[in-house]
């Protein structure tokens, strides 16, 4: 469960960071 939450947060952070950087 903890891994799932971290994975989702990581994906959100990566997607937000990539969108802002692009």
UniProtKB/Swiss-Prot annotation:
UniProt entry keywords in alphabetical sequence: Amino-acid biosynthesis, Branched-chain amino acid biosynthesis, Leader peptide, Leucine biosynthesis
BP GO terms, sorted: L-leucine biosynthetic process
Domain of life assignment: Bacteria
Composition skew (Low complexity), residue ranges: 11-22
Span list, region Disordered: 1-22
Function text: Involved in control of the biosynthesis of leucine.
Protein name: leu leader peptide
Species name: Corynebacterium glutamicum (strain ATCC 13032 / DSM 20300 / JCM 1318 / BCRC 11384 / CCUG 27702 / LMG 3730 / NBRC 12168 / NCIMB 10025 / NRRL B-2784 / 534)
Lineage: Bacteria, Bacillati, Actinomycetota, Actinomycetes, Mycobacteriales
